[in-house]
Amino acid sequence: MSEVASTFTQEAALAAKAAGAALRDAPPETRAGLLRDLAEALARPAVQAAVFAANARDIERSKGDIAKGTMSPDLVKRLALDAKKLAAVSDGLQQLAAMSDLVGRVTLRRELDDGLILERVTCPLGLMGVVFEARPDALVQIVGLALRTGNAVLLKGGREAQESNRALAAVVHDVLSARGLDPRAAVLLEDRADVSAVLALDGIVDLIVARGSSEFVRHVRASTRIPVMAHAAGICHLYLHRAAQPAMAARLAVDSKMSYPAACNALETLLWEPGAEAALDASLQALLASGVELRGCPETRARHPHVVAAPDDAWDTEYGAPILSVRRVRDIDEALAHIERHGSRHTDSIVTEDAVAARKFLTSVDSAGVYHNASTRFSDGYRYGLGAEVGISTDKLHARGPVGVDGLLTYRWLLHGHGQVTADYGVGGKRFTHRDL
C-alpha cells in the first residue's frame, strides 16, 4: 500500500472492508431485502422532499459555476434529479432484488479422484472504490449493485453533486442500520484529496470504478496499481448501409442522439455510404428538426449545404451535447476501418436490411456493444435486464459493456478431500479421474 493514503481514508477503507465481510456472509434474502427497503425509502414523500431540496441546492450553486465558465451546462443536465429518475432507480433496485442470488453459486463441480471434489464458487470482489461524475442517481445504482453482491464500497462523487450525494447516502445508511448491518459498508468520501488516497490503497481496495471524462479516466489509470474498470470515451457510431430503410434510419439516429445527448452511449458520429442517400436525407432532416447541430465532411456538405464543416478532430470528439459529426465512407470496409481508428469500443450500430452486411458488421466491430437496426442508447444495465449498472466497461477484462451483478463477482476454488496428498499421484501412482459432476 502506498504511503500517499491518508490515515482517515485507510481507516474508512478497513472499516468498510469489515462491514462488507458481514454483508457477504448475510443470508441472500437479507441482501435482497436491503434493496427493497432502499427502493421503498426513496418512494417516501419526506425522503424525496429532502433529496430534491438537496439537489436544488446543488443546481443553484452550479449556475454560478456555469456563469464563471468553470462548469459545462451539459453537466447540470446530468446533475438534475427528478421524480422520473428516482422512479427509474427504484425500479432498478426492485429488479435487482428479484434476481436469483449469484453469491455462492457453484459454477463448476469436478471429481479429481474418488472422494476428492473440486468446486468453483462465486464470491464478491471485496471492496470497491467508485469515483463518479455529476449524476447523483449513480450513487444509488452503485450502492444497490454493491449490496446485492456482498461488496463494500467507497464512494466519491463530484463536488457539484455534494448535497445530493449526502442526502442519498443518509438514506442508504438508515436502511443498512434498520437491517442491523454496519452502515460503513457504503462510505461517502467528500474531500478531493480522498480520490488520491483511495487510489493508493492497493492491498485494501480490490477494484476502482472510474466514471467521468476521458481525461479523468486516464488520470485514474495512471495513478493506481489497483485494477480499474472504466470507459475512457463514448464515441458511438451509427452506420447507414445502402440497404438501410430511411424511416428506420431517421428514428434510430434521433433516438441515439437526442434521447439523452450527454449520455456515454449517445451517438456522436453518423456514417453513410453511396446508395444510402435516402436514409441520410431522412436522418439529417429529423436530426435538424430535433435541434441537432450537424458537422459534416465535404461529401456530406455537397449534398446538404446547411451542414457545418467538420473540424479535423470531429471524428475523435465526444460532444455530450446536441452536436453530431457526419461522414461519408466508400463501403462497409471503410466504415469498419473508421470505427476501428476513431471509435472508443463502446457501442456501434449498423442500419441495414442486408443480412450479410449486418453479420459482417456484428462480427468485425470490436466494441462492447455491436447492434443491428437498434439505437446505441440500449447500451445500459437497466435496459439489458441487469437491474442497474456500476458503469460501462470498454475493457475486455474483467467485465465488458454494462457492468451489473456478474461483473462485481469473482470466484474461489474449493477442494473437498479425505486426506489426499499430491505424492499419491503421478507416474506409477494413482490417476486423476477429472469427471465433471
Q: What positions do the PLM features span?
A:
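C-terminal core of ALDH-fold dehydrogenases
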Residues: 33, 37, 282-283, 332, ...
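Short, well-ordered beta-strand elements within core beta-sheets of diverse protein domains
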Residues: 19-25, 270-272, 321-330, 345-350
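A structured beta-alpha segment of the ubiquitous adenosine-cofactor-binding alpha/beta core
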Residues: 78, 82, 95, 113, ...
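Conserved small-residue-rich beta-alpha loop and adjacent elements
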Residues: 91, 95-175, 179, 224-228
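N-terminal Rossmann-like NAD(P)+-binding subdomain of aldehyde/semialdehyde dehydrogenases
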Residues: 1-117
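ALDH superfamily catalytic-core signature
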Residues: 3, 7, 46-49, 133-137, ...
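Short, structured coil segments at secondary-structure junctions
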Residues: 149, 203-204, 223-224, 290, ...
